[in-house]
């Protein structure tokens, strides 16, 4: 356990310094204009995988608004053990979700509300940026705290349907990673375009 904690700490330090095992960088596009950047990182050692997703965008929502997003997900033996997701609006915490496996179940805390889940989570939103979900029919959203449906549309193209509001995100893959992600959002739709 001590070695696991040390590994996770080192992963977070490495992620903070930009030393990722696998990385991706995307432009965030709204209305045809670049408004920010989205970065992805994955590092693995033995049977432990750590994913980190980060973004920062400035959009006009009646006034100029800067939105930052941070997600860290830790898997051990292909099972989610812990994730932390925080979104900030103009520097103030806007939403927070934590998921933690302990004593045979997950405790999910979203904005102060707690739920539990008994079955192991093996595929999450963070993993979508590093592996094509071939044969997968649902994905756990670390930010929402629940499962969303995945549908394969055609070769290398998938839809993720939000179980709460039925918004649809489209993922287009090339060589196992998404090159384009179109996201339907209640405030505005946006697109992630891979640029490396």
Locate the predicted segments by residue.
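Intrinsically disordered, low-complexity segments enriched in small/polar residues
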Residues: 7, 24, 49, 67, ...
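N-terminal helix-cap/turn-to-beta initiation motif at the start of protein domains
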Residues: 19-21
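N-terminal mature ectodomain segment of secretory-pathway/periplasmic proteins
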Residues: 23-100
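Solvent-exposed helix/loop surface patches that form functional interfaces
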Residues: 31, 81-195
């Amino acid at each position: 356990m001590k070695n696991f904690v040390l590994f996770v700490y080192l992963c977070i330090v490495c992620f903070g310094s930009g030393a990722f095992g696998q990385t991706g960088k995307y432009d965030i596009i709204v209305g045809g204009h670049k408004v920010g950047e989205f970065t992805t990182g994955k590092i693995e050692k033995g049977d432990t995988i750590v994913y980190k997703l980060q973004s920062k965008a400035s959009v006009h929502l009646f006034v100029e608004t800067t939105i930052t997003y941070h997600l860290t997900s830790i898997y051990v033996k292909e099972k989610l053990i812990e994730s932390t997701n925080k979104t900030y609006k103009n520097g103030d915490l806007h939403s927070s979700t934590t998921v933690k496996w302990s004593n045979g179940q997950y405790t999910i805390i979203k904005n102060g509300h707690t739920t539990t889940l008994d079955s192991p989570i093996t595929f999450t939103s963070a993993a979508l940026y590093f592996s094509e979900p071939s044969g997968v029919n649902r994905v756990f959203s670390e930010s929402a705290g629940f499962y969303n449906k995945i549908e394969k549309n055609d070769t290398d193209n998938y839809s993720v349907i939000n179980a709460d509001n039925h918004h649809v995100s489209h993922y287009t893959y090339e060589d196992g990673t998404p090159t384009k992600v179109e996201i339907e959002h209640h405030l505005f739709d946006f697109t992630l375009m891979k640029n490396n």
